Each structure stands twice: as structure tokens, then as C-alpha cells.
Amino acid sequence: MKKAVTLLDGSVGQELVKQYGEKPTPLWSTEIMLKDPNMVSNIHSAYFEAGATVATTNSYTILRDRLKHFELEHEVHNLWNSSVAAACKARDKFGSGRIAGSIGPLVASYRPDICPP
């Protein structure tokens, strides 16, 4: 029996740190989505070209409670859409592939007893 292999992309976040050239902040990967979503799309493209068949959205830190601390909670939907669009742009450029969403840690994000609103 032949088994299929699904190859995910690598660490989008660490590539952003490497390519962005600035020290990461609590919003570093989210900040890139606001300033230069093409950088994210280019990273996805490089992973597709290297053989990945799935691009993971750059959305791990796009959490309303985190954004609220920086008065950016109104951007949550725009940022999610932008992270999906960046991955789709790379996939469409490559010609094939799938997109997987990346959701941050549930404990810190969704438990009001640990992380109050």
C-alpha cells in the first residue's frame, strides 16, 4: 500500500524574524501583516518552491486579547483575511497546494480565568 506524504511549510514566524531584520516584539508577526504582507507571501512562495504542499497562515499571534493591549483589536478580521490572502497568493502563484490556518494557544487566549478580557 502506497502512503501519501503531506509536506507542510516551515516556520513562517522564524523566517519573518530572519528577513525582517528587527528584534521581535509581542506583535512582530502581526506587525508584518500590517506593514508588508508581501513579505509573508514571498515566504510562503519559497516554501512551495522547496516542495511544501501546505502553507500555514501567519495568524498564530492574531488574537483579539493580544491586539487589545495595543489598541488594535479592531484589526482582527482584517489581519486574519490578510494572512489567508498572503498564503493564497503564494499558492496561486505556485499553481497548487492547500492552506492551513494557524491558531494561537487556547489556554492563554480563551480562558478568562487565566487571561481576563
Q: What do these predicted regions represent?
A:
Residues 1-117:
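Domain-level signal for soluble alpha/beta catalytic cores
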